Each structure stands twice: as structure tokens, then as C-alpha cells.
Amino acid sequence: MSKVFKLHSEFKPAGDQPQAISKLEEGLEDGLAHQTLLGVTGSGKTFTVANVIADLNRPTMVLAPNKTLAAQLYGEMKEFFPENAVEYFVSYYDYYQPEAYVPSSDTFIEKDAAVNEHIEQMRLSATKALLERRDVIVVASVSAIYGLGDPDLYLKMMLHLTKGMIIDQRSILRRLAELQYARNDQAFQRATFRVRGEVIDVFPAESDELALRIELFDEEVERLSLFDPLTGQIEQVVQRFTIYPKSHYVTPRERILQAMEEIKVDLAERRKVLLANNKLLEEQRLTQRTQFDLEMMKELGYCSGIENYSRYLSGRKEGEPPPTLFDYLPADGLLVVDESHVTIPQIGAMYKGDRSRKETLVEYGFRLPSALDNRPMRFEEFEALAPQTIYVSATPGKYELEKSGDDIIDQVVRPTGLLDPLIEVRPVTTQVDDLLSEIRKRVAINERVLVTTLTKRMAEDLTEYLEEHGERVRYLHSDIDTVERVEIIRDLRLGEFDVLVGINLLREGLDMPEVSLVAILDADKEGFLRSERSLIQTIGRAARNLNGKAILYGDRITDSMARAISETERRRAKQQAFNEENGIVPQGLNKKVSDVLQLGKPGNRGKGRGKGKAAENVGQYKNLTPKALDQKIRELEAQMYTHAQNLEFELAAGLRDEIHQLREQFIAIS
């Protein structure tokens, strides 16, 4: 059954959107491998991409440069496609300290990591959707280029059940154990199963709301049903069901035994090399560590750091690329690279950093050379694997422009009629006093101001100066974690303060329609923060306001400033001509502040009496750090299961609604 993408929106494509949609679709149908959508801030790039996906009906992966932007895109796509599979695939580590060795101080650092269970469940849900259906959009971070379990082995491990199938209970239980599910008759949670007579309840690893009940009679599957694990209420009777492994890295027993033999051969060869070079300590260390890992694999089927042996487990040859999320994407899939000027360089950088750390581990006998093949994809491997690609950015990089050639689609005209900000260049000598008078003009009419400086020191001094002069100002810097950053931007929009000072505000990627003035101090100092691309991005922060204006403080106009001003004026002129031609009066954006943290509407979950109470309770946790929030979710889950065991289903359901909302908040801030 192949479902079709169904786009839900109260708006129709307008402005430059219709021509951008038709050009992108035309290019994809003509087989173009690379296209670039050059869309200005506020022109509805996500809506354009959503229309292309819906019209062509192809499974799509959207790559975002960080978790914050991925969460925002996921929320938007969920709203556009509520009836289709919109999935979220980012790193599931809350904390990650990779294995490393520092030769200068002879210090070995053990791997240490904390995995977030909810994000792990969403990753499993993403790969399941890609394997089962075509109406899929996976919003991913650069985590997508890191090694994942081999899709062929993953498919072989699945347990298919159908009504009327002849299979005995012990066979089902054995297969569940092979899939790394644990039996737990007391606390029924994700990736566990329980047995009651001839009834087996399984909580699938990729599900967060429904579990499977298998009812057997005389070694035959009599009935398969999906039920609410909290209340026990049957939601749906199904004819067939596929149980997926608990992890992407599950490997069949025979493959593990085969891998162990290959590891022994490689260990013997490596020992010879180390002894020949008189590296006795390294040889002893490697032998001891590898033999311990082999013993663990033999007894348990896995070991700590098993990813370092992934080459043997997936049957790859030395130097071959690891299987990644791209291997799960169908051949006719589509790749959308959002904020491509940031994302593309990130993909290229991942491999090199990983490689240098691993080479030290191999050289000093902590790992076999095969550990070097547990790595992210190299950039050229990414290029070879990537399907037809659309790069989306307001300021595309050199790579995208070269690859796209003439296939660059402009989306400069905004449907709202909003013009790009007016730009003024003013002298540096009086920049602080001039800025203060401009801020006061904006505050008087309830508008907000962004100020970007070159150094941390200057940002701190400016914040202090503005505070002394009675302005409500906050300072955004790298030491502030994601949750606090989102809160600061939310407070700016709500009017808790009027001025936000920062060094690199263009990275936020969050919409702030209340901002009417962007002030760029020391704009004439050439460099990374004052390049043409950075200036256009920063100026664009005021492009969602009717009175948008950017002031560049500089004693001369640099080449970067000239190009940024010229490009902004070109876009402004094009928008103005469109407005006059179509009789459009520019309208300010009126985006609800709650939208900043919203992560896709959670469907029909939690309707009813407990919902308001849940929302009320969630409010008291809004200032928690991601780590504290994760701990709170675990505590509430434990309480929920206790209520369910005591048959207090109303209390359990209320806690479940609260947990759902906290999880959405957690993903938005992590």
C-alpha cells in the first residue's frame, strides 16, 4: 500500500513560490542531480519544499545543520503533513565522551555516553518508516552520515507475524531475545515483553504509544491486536505485524561467530607488526583488550565498544564506507539540504576529526586498525550516495553554486509583500551613542533590536553601558545552553526586554518578527563574522518586520559590505516591483510566540480532561536544563507505570499527557 503525501495548509503558493515550485519539479523530473533554492528570509522556503515533496510524492530526507533547526523543521513538516510519516533523526546522545588517548601525558580516556531513550525510539521509528512506506519525510542532522546498522542484516532480523501462522511460543520468545528485547513481567516498557499463559505482550522498540498482543492457541497465532500499554484497552485488531530489532546494531549469531574468527586473524597479524617494531607494551595492551572483547561477544553477543568491530559485523572490506541512514533511503529518494552554506562544510569536516583521534588509538595498541572503519562518511562518499539534491539557503556557498551551475532558483519575492530591510552605513566614531538613540526610537513603539559585535568583551561592555542608560538588554553568548537560548529569544519576542546583544546572532535560525532594527558594529572589519554571507544573514533578521532596518557602522565600505548591500537592494527592488504590479500592501508577520518551542502538533493524543492540567504542570518545568528535564521525564514515567499497575488509569493517562508535552519541549531544546 503506497500512501500519497497530503499537504495541509490554509495558504496557497504566492509571490515567487509558484515559479520556484514548478522549476524545482521540472528539474527533478528532468533528472538534475543538483539544484539550489536561493530563498530570502521570510519567503516561505519550507512551504515551497513541502509543495515539491507533495507533488512528486517521493520519500525525502531533510538535512539540517543542528538539532535546534532540525526540531523547528520537524515541527513545520508535521503541521504540513499530519497524515504522513514525518520522522526525526538526530544524535541520541545527551552526553558523549569518545574514547581517546593523549600520548604526551600517557592518559587514556574511556568512552562515556548517556543515550536519550526517546530520541533512540524516534530514530528507530524513522528507519522503520523508510523500510515500510513511501510517504516519508525524515528530518535529520549531520548524524545521518554516521555509521548505522546494515539495512540488509536489520531486515533479516525482523520478526514477521500473521494471523493463522503456525509457530510455538518458545520460538517467538527466542526470536524476541535475539532482537535484544528483555522479558519484564512487572514494568512493561519500550523494548520489553511479558508472558501470561498463551498471551505474549510486546512493546515495540520504535513505538511510544501502542504495544502488540499476540494470542496463541495450540501453536497457532489466533489474534494480533494493538493496545494501549497503560490502560490495556484494545485499539485495533491487525492481520499481520512486523517486530523490529531493539537497536540498529543487532547482528545474527552466525555473523558474530564469523566476525570473531576474522578479528582473531587480524589480531595475529597486528601483533606481528607491533613486535617487529619492538612495541611490546602496545602488543600486550592490544592482545588483552581484544581477547576480553572476543570473550564478551562469545558469551553475550555484544561487547562495550562493539562499534569498533563494525567492519567485520557488516562484512565490509577495509576502507569501504559504513552503512548510514542514506542506505535506508530508497533509490528514488530526494535530499533537501537546509541552510546548505553551513551544513555542507559540516559534512566535510566530520571525517577528519574522527580519523586523527582513532589513528592515535591504533598506533598505541588500544584498538585494531579496523577501528578506523567505524567512522562517518567521507565527503566524496556522501556525494556518491546522495540522491537528487535541493540545496536551500539565503546565501548559498561556493560548492552549491558550482554544483548547480545554471540551476539556481530565486525565491526573492515574499507572499506577504514584506520588503528587505533598508540599509544605512554610519561612522564608527559615534556608533554607541547613535545606537542608543536608535534603540530608544524602537522601544517607544514596542519594537525589538538586535545588536551584533565582533568580540565577547565588546558585547559585555555594550550590554553594561546600555543597562546603565536604563535600557532592558540581554546578552547572548556561547556559554548559554540551548534551552536558555530559546528562552532568551522567546522573552525578547514577548517584550520581557527590548535589546539583544550577541556576536553571531545569524546562527539562531529562529523567526523574530518583532525585530525591526539590526545594528552591526564594526561592519568594516573584514573576516568571517563580516563576510558577505554573514552580513546578508544578519541583515535578514530584520526582514520579517514592516519597519525593518539595518545599520552598518563602518568608516569605509568594504567589498563584502558593498556586495551585501547590492544584493539586499536587488531583492528589495524586485519585491517592490512585484507589490506594485499586483497591488500588494506589505503585511507584518503575526507569528504566535508559542510556535518557537512547538514541535509539531501531537495528533489526537491526550484529548480530554487531563490535557489542561498537563499543560499547567509542564509550565513549571520550562526553565529546566535538558539533563534535568530528561531526569524529570524518567521520574514521571516511573510514577505512570505505578499508577497503571494499581489500576489508577485516569492518573496514569494524565501523567502520560504531561510526559508527551515534556518530550516535545526536550526535543525542541536539546
UniProtKB/Swiss-Prot annotation:
Domain Helicase ATP-binding: 26-183
MF (Gene Ontology): ATP binding; ATP hydrolysis activity; DNA binding; excinuclease ABC activity; helicase activity
Cystine pairs: none
Record flagged with keyword Hydrolase: yes
UniProt keyword annotations, A-Z: ATP-binding, Cytoplasm, DNA damage, DNA excision, DNA repair, Excision nuclease, Helicase, Hydrolase, Nucleotide-binding, SOS response
Binding site for ATP: 39-46
One GO term describing the cellular component: cytoplasm
Superkingdom assignment: Bacteria
Cell division as UniProt keyword: no
Subcellular location: Cytoplasm
UVR domain residues: 630-665
Gene Ontology biological process: nucleotide-excision repair; SOS response
Helicase C-terminal domain sequence ranges: 431-597
Motif, Beta-hairpin: chain positions: 92-115
Principal subcellular localization: cytoplasm
NCBIfam families noted in UniProt: PRK05298.1, uvrb
Function: The UvrABC repair system catalyzes the recognition and processing of DNA lesions. A damage recognition complex composed of 2 UvrA and 2 UvrB subunits scans DNA for abnormalities. Upon binding of the UvrA(2)B(2) complex to a putative damaged site, the DNA wraps around one UvrB monomer. DNA wrap is dependent on ATP binding by UvrB and probably causes local melting of the DNA helix, facilitating insertion of UvrB beta-hairpin between the DNA strands. Then UvrB probes one DNA strand for the presence of a lesion.
Family: Belongs to the UvrB family.
Description of how the protein assembles with itself and partners: Forms a heterotetramer with UvrA during the search for lesions. Interacts with UvrC in an incision complex.
Entry comment, domain topic: The beta-hairpin motif is involved in DNA binding.
Name the UniProt record assigns to this protein: UvrABC system protein B
Organism: Serratia proteamaculans (strain 568)
GN (gene name): uvrB
